[in-house]
Amino acid sequence: MPTSTICLSFDFDAISAWLTSWSSGRSRPSAVDISRGEFGARVGAPRILDLLKKYDIEATWFVPGHTADTFPDICKRVSREGHEIGYHGYAHEADPRPEEEAEIFKLAMTALKKVYGRDPVGYRFPGLDLADFTIDRLLENGFLYDSSLMGDDFHLYRVRRGDQWSLKGPYKFGSETRLVEIPFSWYLDDWPAFTFSWDPFRYAFTAVDTVYQYWKRHFDYMHECIEDGVYTLCTHPQVIGRAHLITMLEDLIRHMKKANGVRFCQLQEVATEYNKAHPVANP
C-alpha cells in the first residue's frame, strides 16, 4: 500500500435529512429546507462528479434510498461514472428501533439496487451511532465495512458488538466482528462547519480558510507521520457543492496530488485490502 490513501466520501442526503434528522419536529417539511436538499441533487452532485472526473478520482457515495427513489437519474450517473454507492438508511433515519430498521433496510436495498445494479457493501449510519442490532443486520447481509465510528483517525480496525457499560464499574468492551471500521471524524466533515440552521440554531458560517486548514493539516500530519494512513473525508453535495466550497475541495485535491506516494481510493477498496492484511480467524 502507498504511504497515504485518500478516501473521498459524499453523504448524498438530498431532501431526506430535512424530512427526518433535521425536520425540527415541524408538522410539515420546510419548503426552504427542501430546496436546500434539492440543490444538492440538481447542482451540487453534478459539480462534484465533474470535479472527480477532472482529477480521475473514484469516490464513495453514501446514498439514502429516498434519494435514489427521488433523484434516480443523478444517482445512476454516480454509479455509471464508476463510484461506489453505500447504504445510508432510507430517509436518513437517525434513531430507528429494531423493527423499524428491518423495514428501512428492505426499502433502501430495493431503491439502491435500481440505481447501482448490485447490493452495497458499505454503511454509514445517518445518526452516526451503531447499535448491536444494526451491526447484526450488516453482518447477516454480507456487508464488508462501516464508516460511522471515531476510534482512530488514520487506521482501520474491527467493529465490536456486545459492549457493556455501568456508572458503578469500568466500561466492558465486547468482541470484535469481521466488519471493518473505516473511521469518520467531525473534523473532516463539512456539515458541522457550514450548515446553517434556525431550529436548533447553528451559526455555521465558518471561514472557508479555517476549515481548509483543518483538512489540510490532517492530511499533512498523516502523510508525514503515519505509515500507510487512510484519510477519510465526509462531505455532502448540498454543502460542498456550493461555489465557495467546491473550489476549496479542488484546492485540497490539488494539494494532496502534489505529494509523493498518494492515491485516491473507494472505501470498499481499502476495506478489502485490510481484510487481506488482517484476516479474521473465524469470519
Name each region found by the language model.
Residues F205-P283:
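C-terminal domain-boundary segment and adjacent tail
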Residues A45-L49, P72-K76, A102-M109, I135, ...:
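Generic structural signal for well-ordered alpha-helices
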Residues D11, L52, H88, Y123, ...:
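Conserved, mostly hydrophobic/aromatic
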Residues M1-E84, R254-H255, G261:
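Active-site beta->alpha N-cap acidic-glycine motif
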Residues T110-K114, R118-E227:
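Active-site-adjacent pocket scaffolds in enzyme catalytic domains
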Residues P2-I6, Y55-A59, R80-E84, Y116-V121, ...:
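Short, well-ordered coil/turn segments that N-cap beta-strands
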Residues D11-I15, P64-H66, Y90-H92, F125-L128, ...:
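Active-site beta-loop-alpha junctions enriched in small/polar residues
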Residues G37-R42, T60-P72, E93-A102, R124-F133, ...:
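Acidic-and-aromatic substrate-binding clefts and catalytic sites of carbohydrate-active enzymes
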